[in-house]
Amino acid sequence: MSQDFSFTPFPDLETKRLWLRQATQEDTEAVFAVFSDPKVTRFHDLDTFTHLDEAIGVIERWVRSFENGRRIRWGIARKQDNYLIGSCGFRWDEEVNAAVVGYELASEFWRQGIMSEALHAILQYGFGRRGMQFVIAEIMLENVASRSLLEKLGFQSRGVLKERGFWKGEHHDLEQFKLTRSEFTAV
């Protein structure tokens, strides 16, 4: 069953410490700060940003992708000052009523439970309000922290996909994880 994921307005979400909201051009410097850190882009398919224009372009793509119903990308902002410290979101697969999840967080906020909190909120949204059947995540094999995060959220490894990704001039083996609606509600 196919589901229409084109929707408006943008669904803002709230957690104990975070606002999950649409990024705007006012967030350009914050987005640049995240993606100009080589520690953040090490496992990412984007090159490390060197110009503010790259952040402007990413925000524009996030907005366009939401407007055409293909993807949704939430900016992760601290409640205390609404400052954007990362992002997370889904790329919809309407054919199977599912999504692929992606995420990144400014390195100074790693290992504080922030991404776990943000992903839990968007998974609740995806499974509860959008009726998704499952979510897929694909990570580089060396990304131990991401593997730990996914396992904590209940994702199960489905194995390694050889040369699944190609970026930064080379092929990458990726480990694929899957979380079904029933597995998420059981966690």
What are these regions (language model features)?
Residues M1-T41, R73, A77-V187:
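Acyl-donor (CoA/ACP) binding surface of acyl/acetyltransferases
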Residues F35, H44, F66-E67:
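Hydrophobic residues in alpha-helical segments
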Residues K39-R61, I72-W74:
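Conserved GNAT-fold acetyl-CoA-binding loop/helix
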Residues H51-D53, F66, F184:
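A short hydrophobic/aromatic micro-motif that marks alpha-helical segments and, especially, helix-coil
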Residues R61-S65, Y125:
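A generic secondary-structure signal
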Residues R64-R70, F155:
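Short loop/turn motifs at secondary-structure junctions and domain boundaries
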